[in-house]
């Protein structure tokens, strides 16, 4: 509920609690109506903050152009919005697995006892400037394999961790090749793509500049999205503020361009675009990423839960954020809890290389390695379930659902259930988002879990609970996420696996 709040409908590039990363000039009410402003101008929606029980909406426009929707229920009103702006894209299957993002074509690695431990048993520190160390590359062809993008794929495999896709150029000035020509660099990207696909992983590219060739741009930073998709096999695109940071129509036109190119030149590949600075219509082409934040703190988990819920209510069901943040980290408990709850979300971005700490699921050692693996494997097992409800979100309920959508009441219409949600129709997920009575190992309890009327089964213990109650002191040892299944549900699952190519389609 936005009651009593003022919501900025503008591209702020503010990525903390209360900030705006991807505004949408649309809202709807459980009273059976919705409104969408037909504008790209900044706005402000006041839901009774300055005058009780009065909603005041405004945009910095000299004329009034609004669509009104009158309909019964969330699905009908969301579909009215989709009729005007386009239905949400259904992500390709590999997009529901963890993605790893970093730059592997720019930096130098020099031995340093305080650095990151590599496979050769030595520690190295990374520098964007030539420090006399070993320069990285995508394919490890320069006696630098452990610093290459290929080594990332090997690393996930050696730790038995699921990995769906890899972005090897996520960093300013990185590019994806070290030759003197754009075509030479595209061939370099294709070589990585061939290796990745042999291992069940797709590749993508991060974008800081124009996607089409431009005169006067060096080969390193030159782009040709058509050749990248057609020749190198690129199947993911992630935008950033340097390209779509202006937002509004500029950002929307950018993702729309790629949304058309990827299937046309990519053998009918389903577009997988991750963007920010969105607007009404972004959902037609892209999923939303919440921006750059600091992990290792409880606040990072806390504010993302209602963010994910609210995104779906706003017609943007494909929502994601970085695993344990792009910066910070090294808090084992927070790291584990973030991997746990995002098992029950669409996308997972492991954003490595921007901060001082590694961002692999195994980076913190045991017990984090085993617990994170357990939940990544669970996410893979749930692919039939997740994909079914992701398909439903194209013209129905979002995958991550506010409690009031399926269980409307005075209690769920407020903020009392903002830290739990339904994942599809059958899973109730109540993430651990704060320290309550934790011991030194992170074992804790979870208070305030609302179970609607009916019978609910603790997914991990099998214990049965009768609903229409609030659970307090729910035991949450470090390995356990509070997840409940509606009694009588049939959950389609598959074998635990590491990428789409390993799904058992026979048994």
List the model feature ranges, each with a label.
Residues 35, 42-45, 73-74, 103-108, ...:
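Flexible loop/turn segments at secondary-structure boundaries
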Residues 25-26, 32-35, 65, 93-97, ...:
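Beta-sheet entry/capping signal
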Residues 89-255, 262, 283-284:
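Aromatic-lined carbohydrate-binding/catalytic grooves of carbohydrate-active enzymes
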Residues 130-158, 162, 183-187, 195-200, ...:
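Gly/Pro-rich turn-and-neighbor structural signature
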Residues 260, 282-288, 307, 311-321, ...:
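Catalytic core of carbohydrate-active enzymes
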